[in-house]
Amino acid sequence: MAKFIFVTGGVVSSIGKGIVAASLGRLLKSRDYSVSILKLDPYINVDPGTMSPFQHGEVFVTEDGAETDLDLGHYERFTDTSMSRLNSVTTGSIYQAVINKERRGDYQGGTVQVIPHITNEIKERIFRVAENTNPDFVITEIGGTVGDIESLPFLEAIRQFRKEAGRDNVLYMHVTLIPWISSAGEMKTKPTQHSVKELRSIGIQPDVLVCRCDRPLPQGQREKISEFCNVPEEQVITSQDASSIYEVPLMLEREGLAEQTLKLLRMEPRQPNLEQWQNLVERMKRPNRHMDIAIVGKYVQLNDAYLSVVESLGHAAIANDMDIKLHWVNAEDIEKHGASMYLADMAGIVVPGGFGLRGVDGKVAAIEYARLNQIPFLGLCLGMQSSVIEWARNVAKLEDAHSAEFNPEAKNPVINLLPEQRDVVDLGGTMRLGLYPCRLTPDTLTYQLYGQEVIYERHRHRYEFNNAYRSLFLETGYQVSGTSPDGRLVEIIEYADHPFFIATQFHPEFQSRPNHPHPLFFGFIQAAGNHKSQPISDELDNQSTEMSISLS
C-alpha cells in the first residue's frame, strides 16, 4: 500500500509548499522510491484553464491534456516524472462531480452535504492516484493557508484519511514561517505556534514542521517550536532561503527531512543518490559566460505567467555553462517605442504564448527585429503564430495578413481555426490539449537538435498555420521543419538563413527538466551565446552567481 504525505501551509500564502513537496519527492526518488504528487486547490474554478495569467500565473499542461496549477510543473521537473489530470484537483471539480452524482441519483435521495459527500469525493481522488500509478508515496499539497475558509473541506478530508489508511501510512507536514523582526533583533516563533494551534483545532497534529526563514534557525528557537508545537526536535526542519529553488532538495536532505519521513512511515531507510543533482547545482553556480535574453510577452508584470519558460531557459543555461539575465519586455511598449530600444543589446529573443489581440503587433515587431538583425529567436505557440504573421507581411508581401483569431474578416488569414474547433462553444478544456506526435523534416536545424524523426510535445491552442499559404511560404524561404504525422498541421517552422530562428506551435517548456534540458532551449541558448556573450570575471566567478532559474 502507498504511504500518504500531506503538506499544508501556515502564516502566509506563497510560503513554498510546492517546492517543499517537490523537493521531498526528489529526495525519495533518489532513494529508488516511486512518487506521485497531487495538488488540491481550494478555488471554485473547475481548472485554471480560463483564469487570467495575472491572477493565477502559468497554466501547466500535462501529457493527457489537463490544464493545471503551475506547481505541477515543479513536481515534474524535480521528480522527472510526468503527472496527469489525476494529480490536479480543485474545489470546483469536486463540487461538479458531487452535483453530477446527485443529478444521476447516486445518493438515492439523501441530503448532499460537505461531510460526508464532499470529503469522501476528496479522499476518493487521493486514493485514485495511488490506485492508478501504484507509487510508494503519494504526496498531497493542500493549496491556501490553514485558517482559510476555502480549505476547510480539504483539511477535514485529510484529517479523516489517517483513520482510513492507517496511522503508519499517513504523515502530516506543515510548512510555516519564522520571521526575523529587525527591531527586536530575533526570529519569532509565535506565528508558527498559532498556525499549529489552528491546525490542531481542526484535528490535525503535524508530524513534521518545515520552518521557512531567511537565516539559520537558532537551536533555542528550534527547541521552543518543538516544545510549544508538540513536535520532536529532530522533526523541526529548517528551510532557509536559497538563491535557486534547485538548492532546496540538498538543504532539506542535510536537515534530515527524508530520513525523518521514512522513519515515521516505517519505511526502509536507504542511501540517497544525489550526485547528479549536486553536480547540477555546482555547475549552476560556476558559469563561464554571461548574456542577456529578452522575453517579449503580454503578461510580463507577473513573471510566473511564463514560469516554465524561465525554468527551461535556466536548464539550458546550466548545460551551456551560461549565466543569463532575463529582460522582461512588454510587447505593447515595443508598439509605442520600437523594438531597438529594448532589444538592441540582447543575445537572444523569446516570444512566448498568450491569447488575444493585445500586444500582438509588438510581438510581430520584435520578431522582425530578430530576423533582420540575426538575433537568435525562439517562438512558442502565439510566438510561432506571430512569426507567421511577420513573415507574411514583410517577406511574402501580404500586408493585410493576420490571424483569424484577431481579425475574423482578414483577407489573408495565415493563422486559422483548427477544423475540429469550429463548432466549439465552451472555453474550458476544449482546446487542442496534451501530448501529440510531430514528424521532423530531415536536414533542418530542428531535426539536428532533436536527433530523431518523431517527437512528442504538449499543445494548448485552437489556431494553426493556414495550409492555403504553405506553398507561398516555402517559395519565399520559410521552412516547415515539423508537422503532424499526416502532414496536415504545421507544428514547427524555421528560417535557415539565420543563426537560430525556430518557432513551435507546441509548448516545449513543459518537457524540459533540470538534468535534461529541452533540445530547442539548449540550441537557442547555445546560439545566443555565440551571438553575444561576455566572459565572467574571476571576481564574479568567486561569488554565488544567480542564474535565471532563481528568478522563480
UniProtKB/Swiss-Prot annotation:
Positions of the catalytic residues: 381, 507, 509
GO term, biological process aspect, one: pyrimidine nucleobase biosynthetic process
GO MF terms, alphabetically ordered: ATP binding; CTP synthase activity; glutaminase activity; identical protein binding; metal ion binding
Domain Glutamine amidotransferase type-1: 292-534
Modulation of this protein's activity: Allosterically activated by GTP, when glutamine is the substrate; GTP has no effect on the reaction when ammonia is the substrate. The allosteric effector GTP functions by stabilizing the protein conformation that binds the tetrahedral intermediate(s) formed during glutamine hydrolysis. Inhibited by the product CTP, via allosteric rather than competitive inhibition.
Catalytic reactions of this protein: UTP + L-glutamine + ATP + H2O = CTP + L-glutamate + ADP + phosphate + 2 H(+); L-glutamine + H2O = L-glutamate + NH4(+); UTP + NH4(+) + ATP = CTP + ADP + phosphate + 2 H(+)
Region (Disordered): 533-552
Catalytic activity, EC: 6.3.4.2
Keywords: ATP-binding, Glutamine amidotransferase, Ligase, Magnesium, Metal-binding, Nucleotide-binding, Pyrimidine biosynthesis
Entry binding sites for ATP: 14-19, 71
Residues given in the record as CTP binding sites: 13, 148-150, 188-193, 224
Gene3D superfamilies found in the cross-reference section: 3.40.50.880, P-loop containing nucleotide triphosphate hydrolases
Chain sites annotated for binding Mg(2+): 71, 141
The keyword Signal is annotated on this UniProt entry: no
Binding site for L-glutamine: 354, 382-385, 405, 462
Pathway(s): Pyrimidine metabolism; CTP biosynthesis via de novo pathway; CTP from UDP: step 2/2
Binding site for UTP: 13, 188-193, 224
Described function: Catalyzes the ATP-dependent amination of UTP to CTP with either L-glutamine or ammonia as the source of nitrogen. Regulates intracellular CTP levels through interactions with the four ribonucleotide triphosphates.
Record's miscellaneous remark: CTPSs have evolved a hybrid strategy for distinguishing between UTP and CTP. The overlapping regions of the product feedback inhibitory and substrate sites recognize a common feature in both compounds, the triphosphate moiety. To differentiate isosteric substrate and product pyrimidine rings, an additional pocket far from the expected kinase/ligase catalytic site, specifically recognizes the cytosine and ribose portions of the product inhibitor.
Family the UniProt entry places it in: Belongs to the CTP synthase family.
PANTHER family: CTP SYNTHASE (PTHR11550), CTP SYNTHASE-RELATED (PTHR11550:SF0)
Subunit: Homotetramer.
Name this polypeptide is given: CTP synthase
Native species: Picosynechococcus sp. (strain ATCC 27264 / PCC 7002 / PR-6)
